[in-house]
Amino acid sequence: MLHILDKQKSIINKFLAELRDINVQKDSMRFRRNLERIGEISAYELSKTLGYAPKSVTTPLAEAEVQCISDNIVVATILRAGLPLHQGLLNYFDDAENAFVSAYRSYSSESEFEIKVEYIACPSLEGKTLILCDPMLASGASMVAAYETLCAHGGKP
């Protein structure tokens, strides 16, 4: 499912504008915080698509039934640019497992490259919901390589 967050009127547009602004980009702390905020907003939007199951909760007055996320989530990122975005997702999916991929471009010429995966840390993905986050999407090649590597090491999500 594709959900383009900046096509709707919401606060995320402010954070995206600041990420793209050449003057704001110079403020490293603000840049990282905005990526984290975008991760948090993305987590909220993603949560609408996940599986839920009823859970009984004891309140001070009585038992109450609450719908809670039933998916087992793994949040994965491509190091290092994705770390603030990853943290934003974890702020909401705080019981999620983590996966990390270290990848880089290996150039054969000025215009040709392939993605090399250097390192991976990944739990089993079998039967789990994988959220692969990377803010540095240009060609999409790193994202594809990361996904294929994660599945090769952790199984099919």
Q: Which stretches of residues belong to each language-model region?
A:
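PRPP-associated nucleotide enzymes
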Residues: 1-157
